[in-house]
């Protein structure tokens, strides 16, 4: 994740490309404090809970540093909250052959009878029943958000040189 972003930014500079939409993650928020729930873009970045989250934090910092050094760089950072689903064409999104990597395919496989039961793990979350609460975004909405981010940069209506948007429910 890190070196590929640095290489991309170097190539953008070499070829005079000044706009980037970066796919980040809600994992940059770490474990949000209760006063910052629900999480919005003003919530502080906390210690990442995974190496993946840490790389996203570092990537965002690299983008901010590069924008500070190069005033022609315009960046939009999109922080995803659990992308789910697939486009009807199956060109984007999940097509879980084998063991899915997240909960929703298990839910749908159970609903149509491919699985006998649905097991949800974890009962010690800070919620009334101890279960996990998750935010999701449909992959088609995610694709539309990328288009909107590019349109916003190209139209000159961005409010800051680096803008951040959360994408979830």
Where are these regions (language model features)?
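Residues at the N-terminus of a long alpha-helix
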Residues: 41, 47, 132-135, 160
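Structural signature of the Rossmann-like NAD(P)-dependent dehydrogenase/reductase core
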Residues: 20-22, 76-79, 135, 166-168
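Alpha-helical segments that scaffold the active site and NAD(P)H-binding pocket
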Residues: 10-11, 64-65, 108, 112
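Alpha-helical substrate-binding/gating segment
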Residues: 83-86, 105-127, 134-164
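Conserved mid-core alpha-helix of short-chain dehydrogenase/reductase
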Residues: 6-10, 141-144
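Structural/interface elements that position substrates and couple domains in central-metabolism enzymes
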Residues: 7, 168-169
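Residue(s) in the substrate-gating loop at a strand-loop-helix junction
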Residues: 25
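Catalytic helix-loop patch of NAD(P)-dependent Rossmann-fold dehydrogenases
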Residues: 3-7, 14, 18-19, 28-82, ...
């Amino acid at each position: 994740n890190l070196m590929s972003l640095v290489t991309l930014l170097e190539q953008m500079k070499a070829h005079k490309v000044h706009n980037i939409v970066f796919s980040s993650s809600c994992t940059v928020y770490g474990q949000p404090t209760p006063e910052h729930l629900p999480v919005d873009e003003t919530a502080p970045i906390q210690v990442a809970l995974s190496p993946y989250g840490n790389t996203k934090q570092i990537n965002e910092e690299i983008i901010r540093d590069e924008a500070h050094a190069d005033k022609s760089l315009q960046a939009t950072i999109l922080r995803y909250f659990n992308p789910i689903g697939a486009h009807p064409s199956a060109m984007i999104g999940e097509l879980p052959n084998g063991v899915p990597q997240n909960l929703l395919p298990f839910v749908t496989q159970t609903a149509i009878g491919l699985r006998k039961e649905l097991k949800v793990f974890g009962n010690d979350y800070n919620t009334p029943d101890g279960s996990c609460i998750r935010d999701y975004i449909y992959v088609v909405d995610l694709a539309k958000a990328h288009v909107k981010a590019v349109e916003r940069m190209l139209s000159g209506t961005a409010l800051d040189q680096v803008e951040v948007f959360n994408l979830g429910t």
